[in-house]
């Protein structure tokens, strides 16, 4: 399921729980339900082509789906476009989600 409402994004940012790597920041907060939700934020300023932004979003959704998370809201933000190479980017996304599963 996806995060859509601005107040849900705000709640994740205010929780101060986050995981960082070179290219991404992942904010998370527990929610009251049993459903995990994901929001992906990739600025057009950082990745110009919509095709590339969508590839990153699809990779994030796939890593999220494979993680089998329950009762958590997650927001993934691209913070550094210099590291945008498709294979590196997908590895970094998986790395961030694996770190979250360990916590």
Q: Which residues are covered by each model-predicted region?
A:
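Positively charged, solvent-exposed patches that mediate nucleic-acid binding
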Residues: 1-103
């Amino acid at each position: 399921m996806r995060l859509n409402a601005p107040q849900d994004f705000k709640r994740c940012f205010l929780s101060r729980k986050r995981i960082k790597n070179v290219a991404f920041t992942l904010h998370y907060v527990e929610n009251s339900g049993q459903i995990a939700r994901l929001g992906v934020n990739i600025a057009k300023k950082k990745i110009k082509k919509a095709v590339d932004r969508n590839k990153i979003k699809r990779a994030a959704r796939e890593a999220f789906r494979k993680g089998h998370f329950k009762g958590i809201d997650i927001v993934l933000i691209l913070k550094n476009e210099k590291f945008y190479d498709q294979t590196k980017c997908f590895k970094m996304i998986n790395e961030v989600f694996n770190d979250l599963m360990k916590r």
